[in-house]
């Protein structure tokens, strides 16, 4: 297939996919602020549910972070069962184990409590449980006949925005690929953005997940599927990140900064629900699948490099972001404003301790990574397609 044919093929696929992604989607009821997990628990009780499966990871469970929420659920008349087998980049086997646990415990609903991995796993558990199938039966776009069982979310990191999206990403250990489950019913009925839960988050996780939120905001804004709503959420998320991420990293006890970052993450999730992402995610997903690079860290490493590639094709939109975030005025040229934005991203990365390179990329793997990243990236509404040469240069630039 020639390069021109590939472009036509991917644009056709994007056109077909846009019929789903550009439709208005439901938004979760959101409780925000200290104690919002208790408010969510009370709301779950009002849904008339009997027993909820709490999907989380073992470290959070062992630390007792769930205790307040569990007690609030019990006071609301909701019994709980806990599945704490989620690991970073959850696999189909982990999700299948969660589905088995759901049925064994005779639950009627699911609560995700954790980072993006726990939320993604919980989404597919809720969908698979409703359809009496395993993960394989859920993979793809709208593969299941029945909607997910009632599903709720408490994100414990501020970055993925997964509590606002209808996509779940599942890792395939055999192919080193990321598989997706896409269904509007994966959007939670309600979520809590509680900064108190995020208070103890380590600096390096705060930094990486925060840059994930910024990447969502920027890629959704400069992409070809933007709407008035996604533009609003994207710009708002950008400003929240630039105003609060460094402070959240410096002072994790600053609950106002934590809450602002949680809101930035949520807004980023709302933006990508319709506008999707771009090549930063396409490359980062493959670094995560191949080497286990944390998703937020991969995005942070790649974001300024990919924007350098696309700056001529997205100058006006990048300039919009710079002005909205107070980096310059409209009296300046769009080129100058774009330069300020990219430089500010570099400066923010440095300030919060994001490294400029990684030592995990093996030279022998680069061509395979390029193929996988460009195949994935071709499905996203990026301002333009990037070339193999450009992708190769980006990978070399972040390799130490």
Say what each PLM segment does:
Residues 1-82:
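An N-terminal, well-structured beta->alpha segment
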Residues 4-5, 9, 318, 325-400:
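C-terminal charged capping/lid subdomain of soluble metabolic enzymes
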Residues 61-133, 247-258:
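N-terminal small/polar loop signature for handling phosphorylated ligands or for N-terminal nucleophile
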Residues 93-196:
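Glycine/threonine-rich beta-strand-loop-alpha-helix active-site module
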Residues 167-275, 389:
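Carboxylate- and glycine-rich phosphate/diphosphate-binding segment that chelates Mg2+/Mn2+
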Residues 214-218, 261-269, 303, 345, ...:
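Short alpha-helical scaffolding segments that buttress acidic/His motifs in well-ordered protein cores
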Residues 275-340, 346:
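C-terminal catalytic subdomain
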